[in-house]
Amino acid sequence: MKQNFAAIILGGTGQVGGAAVAELLATSECREVVMITRKAIAPRSRVRAVVLDTGAADFAERTAALARGVLSQGPVSAVSCVGVGSGSTRWSEEELLRLELGVVGAFARGCHDAGIAQFCLLSAAGGTARSRFRYVRVMGMKEDTVRNVGFARLAIFRPGIIVGNAHTPAWVGWLGSLVPGSFGNIDQRILGRSIAAEIAWHSREAGEITRENAAMKKLAAQFNSVP
């Protein structure tokens, strides 16, 4: 059952975040999308951009204050679409940790402190803190960081190769079409739609759920078929 809701999103100006915002706005029950950004963006209907310094020591507190205001108008869910994707090879592990754990962790804590119950987290296929591979390991550490915040509902999205994305080279998408299962291709619009569906349909459920490619595609198709 759908209900009126708002979403507060970090990373909404990126490729995947933009797809999630578009799918949320396509849902009539979404009253507002609040985007935390580092700089001002062009005005859009039902979108409120709030400029915050994500690297500031009080970022969590400022997020909490913002979230409380949005919650005063009705149900709110939080979304993190932060990620560097294919650009991760150019980042040091320290830089990745500062973004994926530091910034995302502070955002999550602020949302939780404000009283938001549902958090949607963009991760990556195979994410585990025990991995030998740096990017996958950092994704797993990010999941653990948000998990430890204690949301009543945590939805983790683990896409494989994201296509329809300016950051994904064509040859990588071709390679992904040959890879079966959770590490293969998924279109960013489907990923965004599955996030919108999670918020619209499952915000009042409890517990943690992890969705990989097949589950995201199924949920997005179900959501798309509902008038």
Model regions and ranges:
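NAD(P)H-binding glycine-rich loop region in Rossmannoid oxidoreductase-like domains
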Residues: 7, 35, 48-106, 110-113
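Short beta-strand/turn micro-motifs composed of small residues
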Residues: 11, 37, 123, 158
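Conserved Rossmann-fold NAD(P)-dependent oxidoreductase catalytic core, especially the SDR/UDP-sugar
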Residues: 84, 90-140, 148, 155
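N-terminal Rossmann NAD(P)H-binding glycine-rich loop of SDR-like oxidoreductase domains
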Residues: 2-29
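A structural signal for isolated positions on well-ordered beta-strands in alpha/beta enzyme cores
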Residues: 6-8, 32-34, 119-120, 155
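Short, polar loop motifs at secondary-structure junctions
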Residues: 35-42
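Oxidoreductase cofactor-interface core, primarily capturing Rossmann-like NAD(P)-dependent enzymes
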Residues: 28-31, 128-227
